[in-house]
Amino acid sequence: RGNGKIIQELEGEFRGAGWNVIKLLWGSNWDPLLARDKDGALRQLMLDTLDGDYQAFKANDGAFVRKHFFGRDPRTLELVSKMSDEDVWALRRGGHDAQKVYAAFHAANSHVGGPTVLLVKTVKGWGMGRAGEGKNTAHQAKKLSDDDIRYFRDRFNIPIPDSELPKIPFYKPADDTPEMKYLHERRKALGGYLPARRTRCEESFTVPSLDTFKAVLEPTAAGREISTTQAYVRFLTQLLRDQALGPRVVPILVDEARTFGMEGLFRQIGIYNPEGQKYTPVDKDQVMYYREDKAGQILQEGINEAGGMSSWIAAATSYSTNNRIMVPFYIYYSMFGFQRIGDLAWAAGDMQARGFLLGGTSGRTTLNGEGLQHEDGHSHILAGTIPNCISYDPTFAHEVAVILHHGLKRMVEKQDNVFFYLTLLNENYAMPGLKAGTEEQIIKGMYLLEEGNGGKKTP
């Protein structure tokens, strides 16, 4: 990115999105120069200089900076005419000026009315000197020479004698020093010395019995065939009616609510919008119109799989971050799940997320009308790479109900750190219903659906 100016690029993006932008670019010892820059020559030079040049300046010395930066304009060269090369070299970037860093954070913390971003200019490998400061090799430096270590010690005033330097001893200030007192005060004010992660929620819930979902478990009547996607929606609808656990359910959609037959939930629980619904939806005269509400429960993310997955992760880790159990159900076209947001799915595993991912319209034959790019026959291969992701590809409605119920028992009652992935179909066919006693086999992945007819055996 040496040909560009990343800070100005980011500033434009954040300001365009309505953010408050604070730029921390230059240290305090630049202030006298800027005060004497009556015609704006130094400011213009700063704006015209590319990021690649700024890196090169800090990879050399004061004489180089004088010639190749200030020397680009006679007016700026005159500004530093009475400064030594050492003084020129000592001109700091804003991110290395403690007072300005404090002032920037104070300004950000004091701002009201919107989010604030700090764009801070620093030096790669700051403090390493010739061993890596401002150099691309800073990332590859595995060890420092004795001279480089001595420079680092002197640069940061670390009180270690030359005789001890070859051992590279760990330095810890005495407990009664201002530095240590400050650190202890801040840690206590921030709640402790080590980052803490809650592994179990103090809340507890009892999952409704499997019989609660009998509408999904029973055989379908002749002429009333359904898909496994419809089976999921019926299960979810029933779960939402549970007085205890229902309010903790977080249905998440990314644009496909009507594709999955979930529009009935618009009226039942509404779509969450912190501002309510300021417009009249075009389908207002319908029973299942698009209803947004401040108290809505559905998260409708638009065409934004990464946003939907991020919302899912937030709810799926609420047991740890908020000590509050939430049960997110995120449904999407299965081709746009692990294939598109695989890194987030892996991160969810790292974070010990608990919840359900539902890959709708799965398979290679049920969504050709929208193009081959929708044909998913491999999301389970990707899901299988995440150790705590438990995946199923159910065929029948009762399997969906048994698996979802089992997942609730594990994640809500037992608080196991796993999450579930189910692929769902949109093809309607007859559902045989649950045969008593097969629940455990369904969870294991194989069960006897029906006896064979005793036909001729192959030799």
Provide a role label for each language-model segment.
Residues 75-95, 99-103, 110, 168-442:
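Thiamine diphosphate
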Residues 108, 382, 448-451:
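Short, flexible, glycine/charge-rich loop motifs used to bind or transfer phosphoryl groups or to couple energy/partner
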Residues 2-219, 441-445:
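Long, well-ordered, tryptophan-enriched scaffold segments
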Residues 11, 111-113, 386, 415-417, ...:
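Short gly/pro-enriched beta-turn/loop segments at secondary-structure junctions
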Residues 132-135, 140, 147, 418, ...:
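C-terminal catalytic subdomain
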